[in-house]
């Protein structure tokens, strides 16, 4: 009845869905009580106020249909008749609109005519304030500005050294001019000796300062590199589960590896080349003093360098993008193949996998070759411009010398100065190509760093958990356009109660526990522990007090003791052994040569499946959590190991709330209460013998199947 009542107020339904899209939980009844004062549904003004109260930034606009593709979606299409709906995507190529019908609770694809018939020109754009802050602080090249400011003293030292290097670069051509025009003409050997010694001193200082500049600059960029690497890893571990579930492992690894490209660019000659280019204005002034005509030739060549880069860059960027995509595909396929090596060998499908790898590798090599060819063409184009300018300067300079407007020494000095000007330009042309690749790397890495971390409406570290759990009117789906996983689930679990949850695959059993761990926020309703809404709780505080054992558990490449004491490496050995005994793992650990110091290998490869599972159970128990979740935890155990754990179950459950999810009904038959789920709803609940009395019930049906 309550859900139907909410469905009548489509504005409230839309607000609930958009809030969930932005990882914000709300209580519809509370919103209705505060903002729907006349009981007729949310008005436009009250809707905007309600959104603001949820830390959402909402704006009412009027937009023509032809410009809808420019707005941020999803957005709410506001209708004066109350028949609001969500606009999810605009397909401009096919003139189609992906919408979400709030009344029918289903996505719809509308044609141009159908959309025009129901669109009244009013939109409400919605974004979270956290998203706005995130956009302002998004990862791009501006991220390095605070780092430059932080290490401004070091960069100032680099700038000072660069000034001296440019002065030395300016002095050297003057020495050559004096030698050509004065020393050779007047046969001044003493002057020649003085100039030679001075030039040698300048060269020594130039070499020392150049090396010092490279050292100081590399040292500062290495610090920035460490900061970026640390920030990247912290951010990666703070991302929500949904980020990893929607991306391939290899793709994520490939994006993280793009840090190497950025590192190489920064620690190279990028910024030093820019500094050298800035000092070129001084060289131009000296060159103009020597010969305005020759200087104009040099200046006239600069637009050609720029135009050539403008022509090459878009093509190069597209090819680099394609190269990265193929590299990410290869990385993902390689990770998948290594992870599934047992299956590949067991099914003897190595030839098929090799064939797929060969095709993908060939595509990557071809894409990489196209990038190399285009980069080579770009470099050769720059060389062509440089050589052409050199020939023109040689011809024009010779004419000026012959006509007496320029001395030979001045011509040589001018050519040396022009080399000092053109060299940074050529380096920048090469760096511009590198910059295109780094731009791709920044974009790819930004997919990680710009993704919002787990968000919540506060960081409430509540008191120690007692164990009362409440699911109220829970409605949940993993995506707005995905099927409903949980529908109007209401469940009360008392402190210290042992609850078994059974049902067919896909009935929503594991999803309940994910909501309890706050991996996701329900679309509607509340999850409470000891009366506290988990939407307001600090996820780390919550998860430290919940023990979880899954069907497939991952062990780290460390010792058994370190794996069990993962959350508290300094815990006493007695606690580790006690947890291992409860999990039935102590006996087999004692038989190992290194005992608790045995390294388990990557993902626990050095142990059997049952042994890994028992260590995972010990890891969940070692912190004495007040809530314990067993999600098919014993399904991978042999009967003897399962028997040991079931014998210890009374001790395991003592003083804590336990949720047992199982397909094997024998695992849950002694539970205080058994919850039976079907298609996201609770269809039965009671004790084992009570449920068997209903011969037409799902539990009896599953029990009969297992008996047979």
UniProtKB/Swiss-Prot annotation:
Enzyme Commission number(s) from the entry: 7.4.2.5
One annotated GO molecular function: ATPase-coupled lipid transmembrane transporter activity
Its membrane topology: Multi-pass membrane protein
Principal cellular location given in the protein's record: membrane
Annotated ABC transporter domain residues: 469-704
Top enzyme class: translocase
Family, per entry: Belongs to the ABC transporter superfamily. Protein-1 exporter (TC 3.A.1.109) family.
Role played: Part of the ABC transporter complex LktBD involved in leukotoxin export. Transmembrane domains (TMD) form a pore in the inner membrane and the ATP-binding domain (NBD) is responsible for energy generation.
Subunit structure: Homodimer.
UniProt-listed PANTHER family: ATP-BINDING CASSETTE SUB-FAMILY B (PTHR24221), BLL6336 PROTEIN (PTHR24221:SF647)
Name of the protein described by the UniProt record: Leukotoxin translocation ATP-binding protein LktB
